[in-house]
Amino acid sequence: MRSPTPIQRRLNELGLRSRLRRNPRLQGRILAPAGLRQRPPATAGLYFPFYHDVPREYAAGLRRHLNAFRELGPLVSWDAALAVLTGGRRLDGPMFCLSFDDGHASWRDVVAPMLADLGVPATFFITTGLIGQPGNLSWADCRDLLAAGHTIGSHTVTHPRLADCDDETAVREIAGSKRELEDELGAAISDFAAPYGNPAVDLGKRDVTAARAAGYRSFATTLRPAMHTGDSPMWIHRQGLHPAWPLLAVRTRVHG
């Protein structure tokens, strides 16, 4: 596991990174100026924007983001995105594949109705240990997402940083969450997103190997570059966003 950079260590010491995470509007204002230097993509590229919680106060922001993506190219399902990577579907321009992490109740109350209104598919990566906890989905809610045509993926059992887990624990988190989801939902679970997701500090090749052995067809990280036909589904690049961010900040994170 690679050590944090000096800048990352200093930000951690000052508490600035956690403060920014607690204040997404400030974070968005900091990211936005760099977006002036980025142009929306005009060439072919597959992007995987993802979100976490979407409280009602940020619903309008999420809708703005999704409409901005749709102006550039289609928002497609996870199946369709993997078909692009494996050569089963052409990539003629910018294309976007939307996902959400953890298991927040706002997915039921805010996100799912919006996606239905816009006709947008999404993948929901579930941390199984959160299901049924206050502020999170129930298993019935997860079944409703499946019934609405969305994809369910695994996000481990307890949301650990996999790099901090021993081999046995990592396998239990990766394979155990898949089994639990399949038992509860009665559907095959084929896609995995690593918590935190930075290959430099949060996960390693061992975890990809464990996911492949468990029967997953895709493994998602938080690397940012666009993907193209021929790239590996076992090393998906996703771009983390917050619905409070202005569109220039989204441009910085997705297209930067």
Regions found by a protein language model. Name each.
Residues 129-131, 225:
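Short beta-alpha junction loops
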Residues 76, 123-125, 153, 219-220:
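Structural detector of well-ordered beta-strand residues that form the stable sheet scaffold
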Residues 131-135, 200-202:
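Active-site glycine- and acidic-residue-rich loops that bind
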Residues 131, 138-142, 146-170:
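Histidine/lysine/aspartate-rich catalytic loop segments that bind and position anionic ligands
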Residues 107-128:
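A short alpha/beta connector and helix-capping loop motif
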Residues 1-99, 104-106, 164-256:
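C-terminal active-site subregion of NodB/CE4 polysaccharide deacetylases
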Residues 52-53, 126-128, 156-160, 193:
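Short, histidine-centered active-site or binding-site loop motifs used for metal coordination
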